[in-house]
């Protein structure tokens, strides 16, 4: 049994707390997933972990969207969709 029972309280400690950073949210999310995958959490703790995980995923998506928007503003027209290679030469930018 790789996980100690002490890992479970983090799933429900502060369910609405905003993570300090994207990296902190991802680390907490990884811990929650590992706890849930272990199968050792009781039903209520699993539900709390799922809810917290959903909050963390939403937070991470929002952070990524904000960062993407900032990159778009900084790069202007330099960004092209990944599949749009027909009119660009990636080597020509160097």
Curated annotation (Swiss-Prot):
- What EC number(s) does the entry state? 3.1.11.6
GO cellular component term, pick one: cytosol
User: What InterPro entries does this protein map onto?
Assistant: Exonuc_VII_S, Exonuc_VII_ssu_sf
UniProt-annotated stretches for the region Disordered: 1-21
Nuclease recorded as keyword: yes
Q: Name one Pfam family in it.
A: Exonuc_VII_S
Which GO molecular function annotations are given, in alphabetical order? exodeoxyribonuclease VII activity
Tell me the compartments it is located in.
Cytoplasm
Q: Which GO terms describe its biological process?
A: DNA catabolic process
Which reaction(s) are listed as its catalytic activity? Answer: Exonucleolytic cleavage in either 5'- to 3'- or 3'- to 5'-direction to yield nucleoside 5'-phosphates
Keyword Ribosomal protein in the entry? The reply is no
What is the annotated quaternary arrangement, including any partners? Heterooligomer composed of large and small subunits.
Physiological role: Bidirectionally degrades single-stranded DNA into large acid-insoluble oligonucleotides, which are then degraded further into small acid-soluble oligonucleotides.
Q: What family does the database annotate?
A: Belongs to the XseB family.
Specify the protein name.
Exodeoxyribonuclease 7 small subunit
Which species is this UniProt entry from? Ralstonia pickettii (strain 12J)
**Organism ancestry:** Bacteria, Pseudomonadati, Pseudomonadota, Betaproteobacteria, Burkholderiales
């Amino acid at each position: 049994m790789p996980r100690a029972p002490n890992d479970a309280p983090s799933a429900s400690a502060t369910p609405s707390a905003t993570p300090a950073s994207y990296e902190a949210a991802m680390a907490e999310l990884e811990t929650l997933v590992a706890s849930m995958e272990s199968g050792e959490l009781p039903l209520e703790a699993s539900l709390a972990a799922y809810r917290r995980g959903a909050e963390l995923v939403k937070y991470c998506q929002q952070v990524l969207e904000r960062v993407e928007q900032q990159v778009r503003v900084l790069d202007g027209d330099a960004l092209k969709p990944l599949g749009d290679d027909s009119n660009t030469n990636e080597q020509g930018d160097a």
